[in-house]
Amino acid sequence: MKRTPHLLAIQSHVVFGHAGNSAAVFPMQRIGVNVWPLNTVQFSNHTQYGQWAGEVLAPAQIPALVEGISNIGELGHCDAVLSGYLGSAEQGRAILAGVERIKAVNPKALYLCDPVMGHPEKGCIVPPEVSAFLLEEAAARADILCPNQLELDSFCGRRAQSLEDCVNMARSLLKRGPQVVVVKHLAYPGRAEDQFEMLLVTAEHSWHLRRPLLAFPRQPVGVGDLTSGLFLARVMLGDSWVQAFEFTAAAVHEVLLETQACASYELQLVRAQDRIAHPRVRFEAQLLAL
């Protein structure tokens, strides 16, 4: 029997709706990955509602929980770590300590960093100390880095002016340590307004993918969290970078189609679960000569 991979997901959680782990855990489980959720914050709902209740996990709890897993002899079974929204830079450093602890017992474990800072259309949503931590410390420790356009621009200290510019900027991040960069949401000047674009960049190659841009009265939250989670899960299940990239685009599109059909502000993960596992659509990534 083929072994089921295990993934430690360290990011935010909302009681109502879908963001952070609440957007990523169930889809990753649905496609065949055991997920260990470690919630950096627990809020009543995501912050785009404008009001919420809840609290941030004390940073010291993160290594303590990782050590607790070690104490029962299970830490070596962890095949990957996913990190997302951070409540503080101190929390981020605690996550890196946890990643180091896991890699000490399983050197093959992957670390995907989703450097959540904000949204190209909404601006930065995290404190300056968190942005600085992501830019100066986290990127160098990640095997996979998954920024959106705002975050890519922040890493490189300038705004991208073209698709080629985005490729060059993503490739510059590889020099800091990651094996691969996935730009989850491209927003460069001159792009097609009716398309949602993504980018996959390794040291040798780059791939560009487009899917239809679906219209919503209010853009659902958690799409980036869903994207990062599914990409890592598919890699853990044996996909190549490109296969995982194409699958993720298709599965996320299926969720958005269902969400749009329901006229919902929250992602319709449960209703779309079969199409997450078996997308009906396929978007082919184009190999760029860049």
From Swiss-Prot:
Pathway annotation: Cofactor metabolism; pyridoxal 5'-phosphate salvage; pyridoxal 5'-phosphate from pyridoxal: step 1/1
Keyword Transferase present in the record's keywords: the answer is: yes
**Which CDD domains does the entry link to?**
pyridoxal_pyridoxamine_kinase
Q: Which Pfam families match?
A: Phos_pyr_kin
GO MF terms held by the record: ATP binding; magnesium ion binding; pyridoxal kinase activity
Write down the InterPro entries for this protein, in alphabetical order: PM/HMP-P_kinase-1, PyrdxlKinase, Pyridoxal_kinase_PdxY, Ribokinase-like
Record-linked SUPFAM superfamilies: Ribokinase-like
Q: Give its E.C. classification number.
A: 2.7.1.35
Positions bound to substrate: S12, T47, Q48, D225
Cite the entry's keywords alphabetically: ATP-binding, Kinase, Magnesium, Nucleotide-binding, Transferase
Annotated binding of ATP, by residue: D114, E151, K184, R211, P212, L213, L214
What is the recorded function of this protein according to its Swiss-Prot or TrEMBL entry?
Answer: Pyridoxal kinase involved in the salvage pathway of pyridoxal 5'-phosphate (PLP). Catalyzes the phosphorylation of pyridoxal to PLP.
Its family?
Belongs to the pyridoxine kinase family. PdxY subfamily.
Q: Which NCBIfam families match?
A: PRK05756.1, pyridox_kin
Protein name, per record: Pyridoxal kinase PdxY
